[in-house]
Amino acid sequence: MRGFFVTGTDTEVGKTVISSGLAALLKDNNRHVGVYKPFLSGISRHHPDSDTSLLKDMSQTSLSHEDITPFAFKAPLAPYVAGKLEGKTVTMEEVLSHWGRIREKHECFIVEGAGGISVPLGEDYLVSHVIKALQLPMIIVARPRLGTINHTFLTVKYAESMGLPIAGIIINGISDSPDEDEKTNPEMIERLCGVPILGVTPKLANVTKETVLHMVKDHINLSLLMNQVGV
């Protein structure tokens, strides 16, 4: 299976904006792209503002909301914690079984995780274990500001310790008037981590299909990305 797994150095770093934008960009380049975000917490998958809805709209996939996100919980917490509150536990086998049912419906897939790669999804597995099982290269979405060097470095080193391939890093949310840390962090992260920076993307005032697509077109190196992940 061709594609990649989008994770982050933290929650709310812009994984879904980047994932959906890349899906739209691949679609724009005549790729038959699917999306899979197995876990969602804190909002209905059918809500127009949900991550699932944005991924579906931007990728133009025929997959249903339930196909894209089979496991949804009410509380805005880590999936394992939110699931326990509802008396639901999702096993790794269930995640992979659902993946097996949808993976052949598209030529390539963008899979999005929940939070960072150490977030617990079930009783005995983390996001990192799902990435390893799917055997897709990772794209790490990171913050631009102070502290991101440490967060990104730790994410990269943990991924490497798990034997997870990393396609690259996207620094998301640069302000209109970047501070010195925002200007210097991308180069420092690339040098310390030994992983290519695929793009540095601005903070969007309004998230729409048009603004997200323009953002990824203008600020992400698509040719480098496609070479890295084989799509």
UniProtKB/Swiss-Prot annotation:
Question: What is the catalytic activity of this protein?
Answer: (7R,8S)-7,8-diammoniononanoate + CO2 + ATP = (4R,5S)-dethiobiotin + ADP + phosphate + 3 H(+)
Its Enzyme Commission number(s) read 6.3.3.3
BP GO annotations: biotin biosynthetic process
Q: In which pathway does it act?
A: Cofactor biosynthesis; biotin biosynthesis; biotin from 7,8-diaminononanoate: step 1/2
Pfam family, any one: AAA_26
Q: Which InterPro entries match?
A: DTB_synth_BioD, P-loop_NTPase
Name where it's found.
Answer: Cytoplasm
* Main location per the UniProt record: cytoplasm
Q: Does the keyword ATP-binding apply?
A: yes
Give me the residues that bind substrate, please.
41
Q: According to its UniProt entry, what is the function of this protein?
A: Catalyzes a mechanistically unusual reaction, the ATP-dependent insertion of CO2 between the N7 and N8 nitrogen atoms of 7,8-diaminopelargonic acid (DAPA, also called 7,8-diammoniononanoate) to form a ureido ring.
Q: What is this protein called?
A: ATP-dependent dethiobiotin synthetase BioD
